[in-house]
Swiss-Prot record:
Disulfide bonds: none annotated. This is UPF0335 protein Atu3758. Belongs to the UPF0335 family. InterPro entries: GapR-like (IPR018753), GapR-like_DNA-bd (IPR046367). Transmembrane segments: none annotated. One of its GO terms (molecular function) is DNA binding.
Amino acid sequence: MMDETSTTETVAAAELRQFIERVERLEEEKAAIQGDIKDVMGEAKGRGYDTKAIRTIIRLRKKDANERIEEETILQTYMAALGME
């Protein structure tokens, strides 16, 4: 009985270690990708593009059309309420 518990704990520890190591590898890949994105944005900035606008466009492209329209409508409503239009 004790041997079975020990085996179960060993298997659980090995499985836990695998999960942790997978996440660590993904974090390393994520850092590399973030570095690549930074390089691309630096290149765009060097060519005269506004990186803030590029990031906004990327964020908007991730949303579906209805969500974008709703966000724009709310923004326009708030701007009008503040006399900004």
